[in-house]
């Protein structure tokens, strides 16, 4: 490529990707699959004395509706569908195992086979819920890792069906709700992640969906990943979660003419 490349002509091809998504009212029924934007970056580097190399980088971004969170239309729709299919799966499994005398291992194998076939179809066929991205290379020991995860998942399904066959549905689901305790323990032992206790309203509401996560708490922070625990809240002050409580105390002290507590250095 010659060095007389017209950079103004290339800059005209760059779509405007700096626009911020506009806010929505709660329970607004917009696009169920999010907003997508593409950003094209052109960079020119000197590859030699008489030749220039033009590098084109295309970045595709999915904008998450962080302003509404769980109250967005898409989140509510998926949550409703998840509750419905979970309810149907649970009681159909109990019906097949208890009344029809089904075998847990065979039922688990059929479910895993169906999941594998449907997952392959969803990966290969274009679908609105998933867009496959080609890989140039795979991580080391990728097949062995996936095989190990598949075997563990099969064992989890079969053991869950065995327990569902021998005990009541309510007791089986109560025991399953304590699974996050072991998740926290394993993540602490293997990954070194630290999990704490909830400290604000949003995280307490999240715990109501799975009571087992509350029992796994051991400090004032919430049992959520660090990226969510230290992220900026969708409402209120634009401060991390750990700074919101001192900021609230500071405002109360100002309104009551009390000695102001010291705020942590930002």
From Swiss-Prot:
Leader peptide range in chain numbering: none
**How is this protein situated with respect to the membrane?**
Multi-pass membrane protein
Taxonomic superkingdom: Eukaryota
Query: Known InterPro entries for this protein?
Result: Sugar_P_trans_dom (IPR004853), TPT_transporter (IPR050186)
- Sequence intervals crossing the membrane: 81-101, 106-126, 142-162, 167-187
Compositional bias, Basic and acidic residues, is annotated for 198-207, 218-236
UniProt keywords, alphabetically: Membrane, Transmembrane, Transmembrane helix
Write out the GO biological process terms: transmembrane transport
Q: Read off the Pfam families from this record.
A: TPT
Q: Where in the cell is it found?
A: Membrane
Which GO MF terms are attached to this record?
antiporter activity
Q: Which GO cellular component terms are attached?
A: Golgi apparatus; membrane
- Identify the stretch(es) annotated as Disordered: 1-28, 196-241
What is this protein for, i.e. what is its function? Putative transporter.
What the record says about family reads: Belongs to the TPT transporter family. SLC35E subfamily.
**Name of the molecule in the record:** Solute carrier family 35 member E2A
